Amino acid sequence: MSPAKDVKVYKKILEQNKDIQDLLDKIVFDAQHGQIWFDENRMLLMHTSILGFLRKDLYQMLGLERTKRFFIRCGYQAGMRDAEVTSKLRPNLNEAEAFMAGPQMHGIRGMVQVEVNELHLSHDLKQFYADFNWLNSFEAEVHLSEFGASDQPACWMLLGYACGYSSFVMGQTIIYQETHCVAQGDEHCRIIGKPLSEWENADELIRFMSPDAVSDEIIALQAELNQLKKNIYTEAESDYTMFNAVGESVAYRKVCDLLKKAAGSKVAVLLQGETGVGKEAFARGIHNGSQRQAQPFVAVNCACIPPDLIESELFGVEKGAFTGAVQSRMGKFERAHGGTIFLDEVVELSPRAQAALLRMLQEGEFERVGDSRTRQVDVRLVAATNEDLEQAVKDGKFRADLYYRLNIFPVIIPPLRERREDIPLLINHFLARFENMYNKTLKGLSDKAKNFMMKYDWPGNIRELENLLERATLLTDHQQEIKLDSLFPQHKDLEAVGETAQSLINVEDLFSENFSLDQLEQNIIRSAMDKSQQNVSEAARMLGISRATLDYRLKKITLG
């Protein structure tokens, strides 16, 4: 292939550990928490022999072709994920130099050393040609160890990685073929890569990138099994599906058990819990699980209605009752006749409205504002508050007799931080909704984003989770993964808050102990090095200084 005049040409041997510091800086060993990270993707450090055992077991179960396809597809996904990270690291380099992050990552991962014979690429002209030697291929070694000499190339995962990485970077399907392989007796492995359309056997090559029919069969069987489960699920299981909330945790099920018992009766229910825990969803569940489900469900947020209008909003008004009342109209209770009324933030009711509500609960009757005629309605009341009603009674803000009437069946909705097992379910639930709403298909959350969400305390509970996921869906491009920054732009500040609070030093105590500033600096540096497992780049990031500065100070400590 003769490159076009303006096609970038890159032809030099990749030197081990040269110009890869930007990639190494993305790797974090967090031994304290048992985690290794490459940017936002969680990694594993494992024995290559494990992959050998896996390859052998899959070969015995599925045969050669399906095992090969499995490893190629695994490698393809790994290459795609690395390309997502590395594509943003080198904006000031030319196309070929930036592309080399992929081969460099192959080496950093300990998979293979890449030697460049030839590389031509141009995004504008959609041209690509690559010729690489692979040295020290882990996959060739594994294959020889488990199967002996092969009659065909055996670096399947490495090949998939190259295809996935190059396809992502170039924005078109790039396919590699392994022309030489150590597993079949060659001196080294060698691959050739170019666009799918330039291969004569394109159909055969793309077949290995496509989902295996066995996975389709398994998915079909799983769908059939799920349908059977839906048809025969027990009455006990149905108790947890009657609510419009989402969850499977023990705390969630306890709430469902309580509300299931209340749903079949006429008793007033008081839902208590922090803001955003889903009180209205549970209130709708009570209504849907009762004999009133075919009748109206009316939700009212008492905090949103001015105090001088709350009584007329709830119980209606007669024409001429006050300035602006030009016609008679029903209140919320009349609209909910035969059904359920949900009063959120009930503590915000005015004293007159509280008195009218108490009468409504005790006698089932009320009067419209400006009317003397008594009316009767049949309504089930579900009230909710995020405040302590008992304390509101002590403070004189809420009537004691109304509190006792509402407190017959209190249910406390747990905050999200106490039902963390439900977070993955809620994430899937909201992502499915927002993907449909914004006509996008996303690849879910990055490992680091998932990890952070599971540890976050969620002061805004489910409502906060919902809002963050909607924002992240808008910010994330189609077919991309949601990154932590899209969910929590301030995530670094959030992580630092706890650490800073715990590590503040009492300056007066230091002065009283005649401390040495040099010694304090040395202790801090040593602590950072220990925490980073002696990774200088990571320690420098923790200290907020450059690697060069930390290198200089480490030398001072050593020489001192």
Curated annotation (Swiss-Prot):
MF terms in GO: ATP binding; ATP hydrolysis activity; metal ion binding; sequence-specific DNA binding
UniProt activity-regulation remark: Activity is triggered by phenol binding.
Gene3D superfamilies membership: 1.10.8.60, Homeodomain-like (1.10.10.60), P-loop containing nucleotide triphosphate hydrolases (3.40.50.300), Trafficking protein particle complex subunit 3 (3.30.1380.20)
Domain annotation Sigma-54 factor interaction: ranges: 245-474
Binding site for ATP: 273-280, 336-345
Residues where Zn(2+) binds: 155, 178, 181, 189
Keywords tagged on the record: Activator, ATP-binding, DNA-binding, Metal-binding, Nucleotide-binding, Transcription, Transcription regulation, Zinc
Cited SMART domains: AAA, V4R
Biological role: Involved in the regulation of the phenol degradation pathway. Activates phenol hydroxylase expression in the presence of phenol.
Free-text comment about domains: Contains an N-terminal signal reception (A) domain, followed by a hinge region (B domain), a transcription activation (C) domain and a C-terminal D domain. The A domain directly responds to external signals, the C domain contains the ATP-binding region that provides energy, and the D domain contains a helix-turn-helix DNA binding motif.
Protein name: Phenol regulator MopR
Gene transcribed to yield this protein: mopR
